[in-house]
Structure formats: C-alpha cells, structure tokens
C-alpha cells in the first residue's frame, strides 16, 4: 500500500542535498566575526542527516567547528532545553559573554535568557517558517534585542 512509498519519499526528503546558500550579507558578517576571533556555535533542532546536509550546503564549516554544532537528534534534547546552551558554557569556561541569535520566540530565547546570555532575534522578513508572534510570548522568552539583518551586528 501507501506505507512503503511514503517511507521512500520521507527517506528522499530527509537525505536530499539542499540547494541553498547564505546571502552575501551573512557571509560578510561571518567573515567579520572570524576576523575578530569570535567563536561561533550552532544550536539546531531536527534530524541529524537533514541538518548536516544543510550545514554542508551552506558551507558553515568555514566558520563553525564541528564540535560547536549541537543538533537535537544527536544531542538528545531540543530547544529550549538548558543543556543545549550549557554545552557551550562548559566547552568554553574561559568565556563570560555569550550571545544567542535566533528567530523563533517560542523556543529560542527562554534558556539563554535564563543563563544571562545576550539574546537577539532576527525579525521575519516573510521567509521564516515560524511565524513570530511576540504578543503571545511570555516576557522571559522575549529577546533582549531585535534586528532586521545579521549585518547589524558587525
């Protein structure tokens, strides 16, 4: 029946190599941070194979070491679990200032806010899969700063 073709389609979807690219502004921002010796990490929810394919397609290895990538399926917990964020605090005990940049007020800022991190939300320009509704977001889940573009952080 339908079960086998559905599994086949799911496999294809989860294992395909996406054709995606970073914008020029994002590349410039990441290059600027690398030049300033700013350590970057990535916390993402999802299946490992899909997220790794996206990371590879975007060329993020140029700026982010593999050990600084937390994928929920590999890590064993999803945002907003504290462990996903505390991982970086344990990995870099000499660092005292952490900043988290995200786009989903429902789960991105709760944990880093509770840990005293700077939290920044990139406002949706209409392409985000998560609708941003700050009116329904509890205060502890709100970002400390909102920007329209990553380049504002250079």
Task: Describe each region flagged by the PLM.
Residues 2-11, 64-68:
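Short, basic/glycine-rich phosphate-binding loops at helix/coil junctions
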Residues 7, 11-41:
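Short, acidic loop-to-helix structural element flanking the phosphoryl-transfer center
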Residues 2, 15, 19, 77-78:
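Alpha-helix initiation/capping motif
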Residues 27, 31, 43, 47-154:
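Asp-based, Mg2+/Mn2+-dependent phosphohydrolase catalytic module
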